[in-house]
């Protein structure tokens, strides 16, 4: 009877992009490789859309549009950083599809990437997704390199 009062809790994070998974340790940026921002996973980006990996609320969109933060329904704070050194582009090559405060569900498009522009600028599109408050959670991260589909494949499971 009381199940109707339970709130839905995020149990998994799904791939926010289509691409190949890599461990954070393989990211050629020490801030992510040494997990200074939190634990998680990274992707070699193939798709031009970054989508929500779970249900939650948009907490932050960087002024330069290279990063987006989500507060998941279970309290996890998720940061998706699109590419490396993309902050230097000043927002060029990105289209914002969500606003701070928007409620999102798994698969909601958040940022669109101009892949041709990124190639012209020689931008590395390795895209880390970290749980910035990862010390507060127990979770398993998919290991090994594997091809994932945006919004379909689980990459992190909370215990």
Q: Where are the model-predicted features located?
A:
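Contiguous, well-folded functional domains in the mature portion of proteins
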Residues: 1-159
């Amino acid at each position: 009877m009381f199940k109707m009062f339970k709130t839905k809790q995020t149990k998994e994070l799904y791939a926010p992009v289509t691409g190949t998974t890599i461990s954070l340790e393989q990211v050629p940026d020490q801030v992510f490789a040494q997990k200074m921002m939190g634990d998680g996973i990274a992707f070699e980006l193939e798709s031009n859309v970054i989508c929500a990996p779970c249900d939650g609320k948009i907490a932050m969109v960087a002024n330069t549009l290279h990063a987006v933060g989500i507060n998941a329904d279970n309290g996890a704070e998720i940061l998706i950083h699109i590419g490396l050194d993309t902050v230097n582009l000043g927002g060029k090559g990105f289209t914002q599809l969500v606003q701070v405060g928007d409620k999102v569900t798994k698969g909601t498009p958040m940022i669109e990437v101009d892949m041709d522009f990124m190639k012209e600028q020689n931008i590395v599109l390795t895209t880390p997704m970290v749980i910035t408050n990862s010390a507060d959670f127990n979770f398993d991260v998919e290991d090994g390199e594997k091809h994932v589909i945006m919004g379909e494949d689980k990459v992190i499971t909370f215990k």
